[in-house]
Regions:
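Protein kinase catalytic-loop region centered on the HRD/HxD motif
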Residues: 151-163
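Activation segment signature within eukaryotic-like protein kinase domains
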Residues: 147-148
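Activation-segment/catalytic-loop signature of the eukaryotic protein kinase fold
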Residues: 110
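Conserved short submotifs of the Hanks-type protein kinase catalytic core
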Residues: 114-128, 132
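Short proline-rich PxxP-based motifs
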Residues: 253-269
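Conserved catalytic-loop aspartate of Hanks-type protein kinases
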Residues: 223
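AlphaC helix of the eukaryotic protein kinase fold
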Residues: 76-98
Length: 322
């Protein structure tokens, strides 16, 4: 097989030269440089680049087989031949093939054999909850509580299917009717999650048992904690467990993860008592002290039923009625 672009071939092996640490810190991430019209697979062409992360570039693509606009999550050049990255891509695709729920993004399989290994996903319109918070600050109960109820229903379904998401956060919730839970890149089947030895997820939204793997096996309660931290952020505009600047790199777990030893600040007084009690319970340190996702749905249903349906669809997307 010919080496992929951007790589050197030494002794028949495709390699990437490692720059010194001071260069790696500021070096742009490797990119395929794909532009509109480039094919990443037969019948699948790039429309535009829409994002990316450490290991992936994300493109909007046109799929001739489905006659639809989809999303392709493409491994970056420096990870395209990395067995661990490929394994994670295939795992994510396999999990999504098992899942069919109206609040979960749909997956359409993995193309692992071509020059641009990628996962194909449903294209979702609308901003993420994080984008909404960045634009408007804390959102109203009319938006927040249906979001919480729908997301909890998805988490209940995942638990029934033996899957834990492990990265529930505002960036991974696309607003809409219903909202959609995205990004299963760190998700695991329950048996696989129980074998994890290192923290997995996004620090501010990780349950204590995710932060400190000595606390026991990971299960659906970790996702309930993540949703609780997300609802707290949406209600207040602040993290449930703020930490000092620079704590991210601390070797002391208690410094890096304040949720291991601290309680969240009380929610604003304007928060209905039933909602405040529920969110606080979802953030309990011990998994057994948290409600299940099904109990979260049951607690929110009567509150949501009494809310007025006041949404404004502006040119910039969903925003709270002020």
């Amino acid at each position: 097989m010919a080496p992929r672009p951007g790589r050197e071939t030494v002794g028949g092996q495709s390699t990437v030269a490692e720059p010194p640490p001071w260069e790696r810190a500021h070096r742009p991430r490797p990119t395929w440089g794909l532009v509109e019209g480039d094919a990443i697979a037969p019948g699948r062409t790039v429309l535009r680049r829409i994002g990316g992360g450490k290991r992936f570039e994300v493109f909007l693509v046109w799929d001739e087989h489905r006659l639809a606009v989809l999303v392709a999550k493409v491994l970056r050049p420096d990870h395209a031949e990395d067995p661990a990255a490929m394994r994670d891509l295939v795992r994510e695709g396999g999990l999504l093939e098992r899942i069919a729920h109206p609040v979960v993004v749909r997956g359409f399989g993995v193309a692992a054999d071509g020059p641009f290994p990628h996962l194909v996903l449903e294209h979702l319109e609308g901003p993420t909850l994080q984008a909404l918070l960045d634009r408007h600050g804390p959102i109203g109960l009319e938006q927040l509580l249906p979001l919480g109820m729908h997301t909890a229903s998805a988490l209940h379904y995942l638990a029934r299917e033996g899957v834990v998401h492990l990265d529930v956060k505002p960036d991974n919730l696309v607003m809409g009717a219903p909202p959609r839970l995205i990004d299963f890149s760190v998700s695991r089947a329950l048996a696989s999650a129980a074998r994890l030895r290192k923290p997995v997820g996004t620090d501010a939204y990780m349950a204590p048992e995710q932060c400190d793997r000595s606390r026991g096996a990971l299960g659906p309660a970790a996702d309930v904690f993540g949703l609780g931290a997300t609802l707290y952020r949406a209600l207040t505009g602040e993290r449930a467990f703020p930490r000092p600047e620079g704590a991210r790199s601390s070797a002391d777990l208690a410094v890096r993860f304040p949720q291991l030893s601290r309680e969240p600040a009380p929610l604003p007084r304007r928060t209905p008592a039933a909602v405040a009690e529920l969110v606080t319970a979802m953030l309990a340190r011990e998994p057994g002290d948290r409600p299940t996702a099904a109990q979260v749905v049951a607690a929110l249903e009567p509150v949501v039923a009494e809310l007025p349906r006041r949404f404004v669809l502006g040119r910039r997307g969903w925003r709270p009625q002020r």
